[in-house]
A protein has these predicted regions:
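Cytosolic, long alpha-helical scaffolding segments
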Residues: 1-167
Length: 167
């Protein structure tokens, strides 16, 4: 859950990169997320090697449950990395106000998608997760349209690629 909180803050900070110079904060949060990811990996590895201990301490029933935690941690860590990169490219790019507003709108859609996906994970709502996976394609198409309209802008390819990877 700490990684989730960090990822949400990073997405929000990346979204406001045009208005605020917060790239250093994003960079620091990414290091925190990386540290927590490796800690989670070590804990999961311990749990797989010592299932009885983990079962007693954390009420975890199976190795499958541990692997689900690993998948969630990997997903969140990827989101953190791509949010950091997207913020870097937004910082480097020179967009007009219309482009900035459109990009912030896309970022808001991605942020909503991430929050809803994590909610589906926490509540174990598979149906919601599957619907969100289907709606992901729509956001990717919005990213592609944004790229096509602005393909002559510096860093746009890298930025759009990171936005699409964030989902």
């Amino acid at each position: 859950k700490k990684m989730d909180v960090i990822a949400r803050a990073m997405i929000n900070d990346a979204k406001t990169t045009f208005d605020e110079d917060n790239y250093e904060n994003i960079e620091q949060r990414d290091r925190d997320a990386n540290r927590l990811f490796f800690l989670a990996c070590r804990a999961i590895k311990f749990g797989l090697r010592n299932p009885l201990t983990v079962s007693q301490l954390f009420n975890i029933e199976s190795g499958e449950e541990l692997l689900n935690y690993r998948l969630a941690a990997t997903y969140i860590e990827k989101v953190c990395d791509t949010a950091k990169r997207a913020a870097r490219y937004m910082h480097l790019a020179k967009f007009n106000e219309k482009q900035k507003k459109e990009l912030i709108k896309i970022f808001t859609q991605i942020e909503y998608q991430f929050i809803e996906m994590m909610d589906a994970y926490y509540t174990n709502n598979r149906e919601k997760a599957l619907k969100l996976c289907d709606s992901k394609e729509e956001i990717i198409q919005v990213c592609d349209k944004f790229y096509l309209k602005n393909r002559n802008s510096d860093w746009i390819g890298f930025l759009v690629n990171n936005l699409k990877t964030m989902m």
